[in-house]
Structure formats: structure tokens, C-alpha cells
Amino acid sequence: MAVQLRIYTINRGALNQWATEWREMIKPLREKLGFKILGAWTIEETNQFAWLLSYDGPSSWATLDKAFHQSDERHEMKPDPARNIARIEHYFIDPVE
């Protein structure tokens, strides 16, 4: 199973708004496409939003991620949640045990 850590630096003053929009728009669409959301957190000290998502299905991660970004539902999100993201980091992570 592939697990990805995503860390978004959010524009100042928009962290709570971003978290709400993520919960209402991004999370449901990711889950609909087959991703599993393992958790999400806000980091107020650094104005960041971190979340873990996984996928263990027949398609590749890249195929599913592309489907998310190209979906009509993603293009129809208003307001566009990406407007509040200043920086994106994402890493595939491996368990220690």
C-alpha cells in the first residue's frame, strides 16, 4: 500500500478556511476516487496543513492522482481551494516496522 505525506504551506490568515474547504471538497473527492485519508492536521505555528493519504488498488497512484486533477468535480470547485496554497510538498513514506 502506498502512503503519501502532503504538507501545504497556507497563505497567512487562511488556515482555518483551507481546512474547512479541504474537509468539504477535497477529501470527499479523493475518497470517491479510491484514496483513503489516514488523517489531517493543522500546524498553526508554521501556517501549514499536513495530511496522509493512501491507495491500494488496481490503478497506479499517478493514474488516480491525474484523475483527481482532471475531474469535472475538481474543476468545478468554487472557490478554488488551491488559491490559498503557497507551497506544496509531498513524499511517499515507508513504515519503520
PLM regions with names:
Residues A40-T42:
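Trp/Gly-enriched beta-strand/coil motifs that build multi-repeat beta-propeller-like domains
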Residues A2-I7, L29-R30, F49-L52:
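Short, structured motif recognition centered on aromatic/hydrophobic residues
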Residues Q17-L38, S54-Y91, V96-E97:
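An amphipathic, aromatic/His-enriched active-site/gating alpha helix that lines ligand/cofactor pockets
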